[in-house]
Amino acid sequence: GTELDMSKDPGAGPHALPYRWRPMTWKYEGKPFVHERTTATQQTGFSFVAQARNWLPNPIGGIFWFGVDDAASTVYFPAYCGITSVPEAYAEGKGDMLTYCSDCAFWTFNKVSNFSYLRYDVMHAEVAKVQNELETRFISNTQLIDNTAKELYQNDPKKALQYLTDYSANTGNYVVNRWEKMFQFLLVKFMDGNVKQEENGVFKYNKYNLCPDHVNNPQLPDWWKKIIIDATGDKLVQPEPKK
């Protein structure tokens, strides 16, 4: 990174969190300071990428790639502009800012993002891996969906709209279900500050098949250790063993 990399200064903490919580402006010894804001922010309600293809019929040519919560950890799914209803998990009335909803997009994505902020350096890598996998799949499916919808549209526009509605709804709901599994995976793997061993999403048990195999505990970076030592002096120094 560069000197502008917000994951590298002490404000990021030992786990390289690029975000800075409010207040963004603050003072020290009477001098004003400001935290910079990342391109993707934690308080994002929703974001989208609008794709317009004028060579296709209007209901097919427009795609609203839609995602909720933090843009850096959301998954954008394709909502064709000709759909007649939205995925249930994204529908109005599914919880609100003060009412938790276990099967709606907003709260499911917030569970994952807010948990990953605790150990961003290791958790966000897991999030990004599945995020890229899903979005790559949706993008690669686009031409097939376009062609099928176009063929239906030529004969019966209503069938084409229903096809697109079903596809967008199923895709959006699938994303939320997959993200709930993402949260469960993160909780199991990173619970209590440990990192459990797994391979392709399958956790490893010890030889007794009762407890996890040996857990990993990544070291804190040296610069963070120095901050602790500078603040505590000799308080945390281990005494020499008695001979």
What does each model-found stretch correspond to?
Residues 1-243:
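C-terminus-biased signal that marks the final domain/tail of proteins
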